[in-house]
Regions:
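Transmembrane alpha-helical segments in integral membrane proteins
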Residues: 60-66, 121-125, 198-229
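Cytoplasmic juxtamembrane interface segments
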Residues: 121-157
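Transmembrane alpha-helical insertion/packing segments
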Residues: 2-120
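Alpha-helical transmembrane segments of multipass membrane proteins
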Residues: 28, 87-95, 117, 121, ...
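Functional transmembrane-helix hotspots
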Residues: 152-181
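Hydrophobic alpha-helical transmembrane segments
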Residues: 50-53, 180-214
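Short, highly charged, low-complexity non-transmembrane loops/tails of multi-pass membrane proteins
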Residues: 171-177, 227-239
Length: 239
C-alpha cells in the first residue's frame, strides 16, 4: 500500500513538473512575440508562432495521460523516462550551447550529443521492456525520456532569444534561409527561426523516440525472455 502511495505521489510530482515545463515554454513564446510585435508583420510569421504552441499543448495532453496511469509498469515507465530524459536534456543543452557560443559547432562536435540522446532513448525503451516484459511500456519510457529532454532543450533555446538575440542575428545574417525568405527584418527572422527549431525538435523527438524505443524494446524483450528460459541454480540442483 505504501509503495502504491509513493508511486502515485511521484506521478503527481512528475505531472506537475511536466505541465510547468510546458507552461514555461508557452510563456516564453507568447512573451517573446509581445516584446517584438513586428514579427507578426512578416510573411507567414503567425504560422511559426502557432506550430510550437500546438505541439506544446499536445505534449501537455501526453504528459497528463502518462502520469495518470497506475500500476508498477507505469511507475517503471516514468522512473526510467525521467532519469534518461534528464541525462539527455543536459546533453542537448550542452550541444545547443556549443552550436551557439563555441567555435566547435560543426557536425563532429555536436553529433555525439544528438545521436547519443537517440541511443539513450533506445536504452530507455530496452529497460522498460526488459523490466515489464512488454513492448509498449518500453516505447512509452522512450517517449517520456524524449519529452523531458526536448522540453528542457526548447526552453533553453527560447531563452536565448531573450539573452543572446544579437548573436543569433549575426549567425543568421548571411543564412541562405534568410536570404530566400523574403523577410526584411533580421531580428524577426532570428526569433521565428528559433520557434521553427523548437517545433522541429518537439515533433522530431516524438518520432525518433518511438522508432528507437521500439528497437530498444525489441532488445529488452529478447533479454527478458532469455532470462526467463535460463534455468535457475536451484532447479539444476533439484534435477
Amino acid at each position: 500500500m505504501n509503495i502504491e502511495r509513493t508511486a502515485a505521489s511521484s506521478a503527481k510530482r512528475l505531472r506537475y513538473a511536466l505541465l510547468c515545463a510546458v507552461a514555461l515554454n508557452l510563456a516564453l513564446v507568447v512573451a517573446r512575440v509581445l516584446l517584438y510585435t513586428p514579427l507578426l508583420a512578416q510573411r507567414n510569421a503567425p504560422l511559426f508562432v502557432l506550430e510550437p504552441v500546438v505541439l506544446l499543448l499536445i505534449y501537455a495532453v501526453i504528459a497528463s495521460v502518462m502520469t495518470a496511469k497506475r500500476g508498477e509498469r507505469w511507475h517503471t515507465v516514468r522512473r526510467t523516462g525521467t532519469i534518461i530524459g534528464l541525462i539527455t536534456g543536459t546533453m542537448w543543452v550542452v550541444n545547443l550551447s556549443l552550436e551557439t557560443f563555441s567555435r566547435f559547432s560543426g557536425i563532429l562536435a555536436t553529433a555525439p550529443f544528438l545521436l547519443g540522446a537517440f541511443v539513450l532513448w533506445g536504452v530507455a525503451g530496452g529497460i522498460g521492456a526488459w523490466r515489464t516484459g512488454a513492448a509498449f511500456p518500453g516505447i512509452a519510457a522512450a517517449i517520456m525520456a524524449a519529452m523531458i529532454c526536448v522540453l528542457i532543450t526548447v526552453a533553453y533555446g527560447f531563452l536565448l532569444t531573450y539573452t543572446s538575440l544579437p548573436r543569433l542575428e549575426r549567425d543568421l545574417a548571411n543564412s541562405p534561409d534568410f536570404l530566400r525568405s523574403g523577410w526584411d527584418d533580421l531580428r524577426a527572422f532570428a526569433i521565428a527561426n528559433t520557434f521553427d527549431s523548437g517545433f522541429s525538435h518537439l515533433l522530431g523527438a516524438l518520432i525518433v523516440s518511438t522508432i528507437f524505443g521500439a528497437i530498444g524494446s525489441g532488445v529488452g524483450l529478447l533479454l527478458n525472455r532469455g532470462a526467463q528460459r535460463r534455468p535457475s541454480p536451484i532447479s539444476l540442483t533439484d534435477a
